């Protein structure tokens, strides 16, 4: 039988392995995002509270922030905006994670298997995993930056309504169109530098930790490549990713949400370094960990749901384990 005919008989996952992995990771990310999104919204609102730089614009939000703490913030959203507002911005978040998760997973596996090369005994040095995780995060996040920008800005719409400010967007597609009209293509990549910095750190924590812990457990303990190993590995990856990524996440959220002039330039911060300095000087070092608790409480179950779902649908689709 000709080679072309044999290829046609192969399952789709073997004929288009990277496309399949992209789609499978997108499906797993969608499940995880829907399950944990309220914590992401709460985290974003917390990160914006007490933003010292707003005082330069005479914004009263600094003194009138209605919430303090994770629980009161979440309850306040439910009481004042409605229960379903806990999922405000979930549509662009799903768009973002399909692109982001698909991009990072395909990139990481390509680097691991082809560029750096895992040894025959499945040993993969930590330093290679760190570099691979960071590079995968950078590429995945750069591709997904427009959707992340829309998600962050839509998450703050409920707060604007409470402060008596006009809403900026009528929906997801209007948000994309408005940002594009006001800032051009470059406007869709506002905040991309702190965004990829955060993604590099988060994926160094998530991908590197999961891959390293999982294969350590499989190779050095009685545990097999099953749901127990996946669960333990994802718990570790969620914690490390939250610790490494929260400061960059605070900076990213503030830069993306800041008001802009007619040229699309930020009115509060010149760069991610400027935002970092202003936050520490105006609010203290711990301001970089605003929203850490909901971030950790979200990252851990998100990581668990994602990895358990991803490993399972890979198995069901005939794709080798991660």
From Swiss-Prot:
Catalysis performed (reactions): H(+)(in) = H(+)(out); chloride(in) = chloride(out)
UniProt record, GO biological process: inner ear development; intracellular triglyceride homeostasis; negative regulation of mitochondrial calcium ion concentration; negative regulation of mitochondrial membrane potential; negative regulation of neuron apoptotic process; positive regulation of cell population proliferation; regulation of D-glucose import
Solcar repeats: 20-114, 124-216, 225-316
Keywords assigned: Cell projection, Membrane, Mitochondrion, Mitochondrion inner membrane, Repeat, Transmembrane, Transmembrane helix, Transport
Transmembrane annotation, as ranges: 22-39, 87-108, 126-143, 194-211, 228-247, 287-310
Annotated InterPro entries: Mito_Metabolite_Transporter (IPR050391), Mitochondrial_sb/sol_carrier (IPR018108), Mt_carrier_dom_sf (IPR023395)
Main location: mitochondrion
Molecular function in Gene Ontology: chloride transmembrane transporter activity; protein homodimerization activity; proton transmembrane transporter activity
Residues annotated as signal peptide: none
Subcellular localization, as worded in the UniProt entry: Mitochondrion inner membrane; Cell projection, Neuron projection
Membrane topology: Multi-pass membrane protein
GO cellular component assignments: apical part of cell; mitochondrial inner membrane; mitochondrion; neuron projection; neuronal cell body
Subunit text: Homotetramer.
Family membership noted in the UniProt record: Belongs to the mitochondrial carrier (TC 2.A.29) family.
Function: Facilitates proton transport across the inner mitochondrial membrane and may dissipate excessive proton gradient associated with oxidative and metabolic stress at neuronal synapses. Regulates glutamate-induced proton conductance in astrocytes, shifting the energy metabolism toward aerobic glycolysis and lactate transfer to neurons for ATP synthesis. Can transport chloride ions with lower efficiency. The transport mechanism remains to be elucidated.
Entry protein name: Mitochondrial uncoupling protein 4
């Amino acid at each position: 039988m000709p080679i072309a005919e044999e290829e046609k008989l192969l399952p789709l996952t073997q004929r288009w392995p990277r496309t399949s992995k992209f789609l499978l990771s997108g499906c797993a990310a969608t499940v995880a995002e829907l399950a944990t999104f309220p914590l992401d919204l709460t985290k974003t609102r917390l990160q914006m509270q007490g933003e010292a730089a707003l005082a330069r614009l005479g914004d009263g939000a600094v003194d009138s922030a209605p919430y303090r703490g994770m629980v009161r913030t979440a309850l306040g959203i439910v009481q004042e905006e409605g229960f379903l507002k806990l999922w405000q911005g979930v549509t662009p978040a799903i768009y973002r994670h399909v692109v982001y998760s698909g991009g990072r997973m395909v990139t990481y596996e390509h680097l691991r298997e082809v560029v750096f090369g895992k040894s025959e005994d499945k040993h993969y040095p930590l330093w290679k995993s760190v570099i691979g995780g960071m590079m995968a995060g950078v590429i995945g996040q750069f591709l997904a930056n427009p959707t992340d920008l829309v998600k962050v800005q839509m998450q703050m719409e409920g707060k604007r309504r409470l402060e008596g400010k006009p809403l900026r967007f009528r929906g997801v597609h209007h948000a994309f169109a408005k940002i594009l009209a006001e800032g051009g293509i470059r406007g869709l990549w506002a905040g991309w530098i702190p965004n990829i910095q955060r993604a590099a750190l988060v994926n160094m924590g998530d991908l590197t930790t999961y891959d390293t812990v999982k294969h350590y457990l499989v190779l050095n303990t009685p545990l097999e490549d099953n749901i127990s190993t996946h669960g333990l590995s994802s718990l570790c990856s969620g914690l490390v990713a939250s610790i490494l990524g929260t400061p960059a996440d605070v900076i990213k959220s503030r830069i993306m949400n800041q008001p802009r002039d007619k040229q699309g330039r930020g009115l509060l911060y010149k760069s991610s370094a400027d935002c970092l300095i202003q936050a520490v000087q105006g609010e203290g070092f711990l301001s970089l960990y605003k929203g850490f608790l909901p971030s950790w409480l979200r990252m851990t179950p998100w990581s668990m749901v994602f990895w358990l779902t991803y490993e399972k649908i890979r198995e069901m689709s005939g794709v080798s384990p991660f």
